Amino acid sequence: SSTGFSLQAMDSSHVALVALLLRSEGFEHYRCDRNISMGMNLNNMAKMLKCAGNDDIITIKADDGSDTVTFMFESPTQDKISDFEMKLMDIDSEHLGIPEAEYHAIVKMPSSEFARICKDLSSIGDTVVISVTKEGVKFSTKGDIGTANIVCRQNTSVDKPEEATVIEMNEPVSLTFALRYMNSFTKATPLSNTVTISLSNELPVVVEYKIAEMGYVRFYLAPKIEEDEEDTKPQV
């Protein structure tokens, strides 16, 4: 749209959703004459983006009504220009309007610390219980070889704000999530020094990484219900 570029994707089991926003003012040049919605295969898009050099300038172009989108990669010295045209997909589902919710607990912590916790716990178990109380935020798991508990207490007396752990809690929360999804989410760690985790009982967790001066990427994951059988999963 004229205000920015937004992307949504959901996994096949409808348990996880990713929402990306890049605001128009963050681009060097941005023009959108009318709102346009495009269906893209993420694997195919990733293949094309991997053809770009680390310092290339990327231009994305699409015409209204066209069944393709063009990715143009220009080297910094402008001595090499590559054009890749990708076929679009027909996707029935509309862009989801995700309502803003009031969360019982919001945890802001270093993104590298969150990634390390998820990686460490996944060597013990398949799920993580995230509990927020006035004591702090606790990440727990159990598996065949034993159990693990990691507690992060509020820590705002750090010189560097990006290394602080800040917890806002209206009421205690305890929810269980699949670690394989959490580990996928932490691949966004290089985007931001901090991650914000928003939790409410019965609602999907929101794991948000801010993209400096441009927008954010948010991951939504439905909690696991312990009594449920493996094949009956709650949906986002």
Swiss-Prot record:
DNA-binding region, as residue ranges, is located at 31-50
GO biological process terms on file: leading strand elongation; mismatch repair; regulation of DNA replication; translesion synthesis
GO-annotated molecular function: DNA binding; DNA polymerase processivity factor activity
Q: Where in the cell is it found?
A: Nucleus
Keywords assigned? DNA replication, DNA-binding, Nucleus
Q: What GO CC terms are in its UniProt record?
A: PCNA complex
Q: Name one Pfam family in it.
A: PCNA_C
Q: Which purpose does this protein serve, as stated in its record? A: This protein is an auxiliary protein of DNA polymerase delta and is involved in the control of eukaryotic DNA replication by increasing the polymerase's processibility during elongation of the leading strand.
Its family?
Belongs to the PCNA family.
The name under which this protein is listed is: Proliferating cell nuclear antigen
Which taxonomic lineage does the organism of this UniProt entry have? Eukaryota, Viridiplantae, Streptophyta, Embryophyta, Tracheophyta
